[in-house]
Curated annotation (Swiss-Prot):
It comes from the Eukaryota. It is found in: Mitochondrion membrane. It catalyses: a ubiquinone + NADH + 5 H(+)(in) = a ubiquinol + NAD(+) + 4 H(+)(out). InterPro entries: NADH_UbQ/plastoQ_OxRdtase_su3 (IPR000440), NDAH_ubi_oxred_su3_sf (IPR038430). The gene is MT-ND3. This is NADH-ubiquinone oxidoreductase chain 3. It is an enzyme of class 7 (translocase). GO terms for cellular component: mitochondrial membrane; NADH dehydrogenase complex.
Amino acid sequence: MNLIMTILTITAALSLILATVSFWLPQMNPDAEKLSPYECGFDPLGSARLPFSLRFFLVAILFLLFDLEIALLLPLPWGDQLNNPTGTFFWATTVLILLTLGLIYEWTQGGLEWAE
């Protein structure tokens, strides 16, 4: 218990010292030249963001969703060693059916069409 209190005291004191020193140090105010973006010959006044395809975003989200589904279903073969494997297989089948219905819905709505 004494060791824990010593470590807590040291960390609290060190945190207080660092906070005090950072408060006392002068704040650096960079000039406008340092705040401007460096673009090596390009006009830095244009938009820094490129347009992002919403369809690509949807496909990426679907990929992550099905990738997570595979990661969740990987331990399923060891589910038959449980006392009640039917419950495990029931919920795994339910998840697969829900994801399949969602995929069919996206497909029928045209969300998976890459080109319009």
